[in-house]
């Protein structure tokens, strides 16, 4: 163990030097008394003188060392006092009793555990955010690629726009006053054509059905998939709605004003053909001679001379449903004005067009109704209708009122082009006359005043 630093060693060293110093002070050897016998050093005088000389030589150095040790002791005492004061201050500040130490350790442990849990949560959150950042970076890169692709497409479209526009729908060049006129001019293909009836201010587009015999039918109604909602207002039925296609595979209503202009334009009357198809693929037809639709001033009234034949039967003449003796009379359509939900012209105290969801030549209400609601599968019931009425696409003389057709077509042709098939009537004697309340309607050319589209 080193004696240089430990306070206890310094104290011992100090007392040893003090003892020697006191001895030297008690007896200082000189040349005069060197040989005087001194009983403390025995009988050998020279030895006593040697010790005296030795002590005399080192006395000054010892005094310096003593002074230095005293200074060090004072410093040690000062430091010791400071340490004691510091210990006392620490004890005053923090001096738990033995019983509280376990609780404090537990509290510190719990606090450490919570801190670790928080650290783990932050680490997990950092990992989650890193994952989100990577995901967003991927989306950002993907969107940048999409933007590049869109810019390329825009550039392609801009290049295409520099070229002259071309119609993607084929519209034939031949025009006429109706589709039969177009067929007479040499048209052989069914499709879209412009016609301009004699009293029309401008031409309009129609779908012409041209057969191999040179018959040109002007189609004004088509149902085939339920893609078009036929619950429209008066203006929409007047102008027409739906879509015309070159292949005749879209639903539409040509427009009451156009039907009126076509069907009343010449002395040659028109014939109406109704084509029906059920959900089993069976088809049937019904033909009506001298068909026409009046002007808007007369609410686009429907009239015809007689039923010209067809296996679908004459639903326009009404049908006896067995509900009332007057069923047939109040479900006939000849002479009826056109009705829509916002323009009621029927014979019913209610509104047939509103309750049946369509526009039609309503009586009270109908036996044939080709603008009705499109029911998938055909069969429907009172429970499936909003008001419990037969509102489907019906033709009561071929199917029941609770069977809705899959496909229908209404088209007209000049009466002299009507093909006479097996079982069809073609004689005026079998004509069914118009209701007595409208006797003038049998005169085809004199009923309507001149009017324009």
Curated annotation (Swiss-Prot):
GO cellular component, one term: endoplasmic reticulum lumen
Site of covalent link Isoglutamyl lysine isopeptide (Gln-Lys) (interchain with K-432): 424
Annotated effect of mutating residue 336 to T: In Asahi; impaired polymerization
Residues the record lists as binding Ca(2+): 344, 346, 348, 350
Modified residues (Phosphoserine): 68
InterPro entries, A to Z: FIB_ANG-like, Fibrinogen-like_C, Fibrinogen_a/b/g_C_1, Fibrinogen_a/b/g_C_dom, Fibrinogen_a/b/g_coil_dom, Fibrinogen_CS
Effect of residue 334 to I: In Baltimore-3; impaired polymerization
Name by which UniProt lists this protein: Fibrinogen gamma chain
Gene designation: FGG
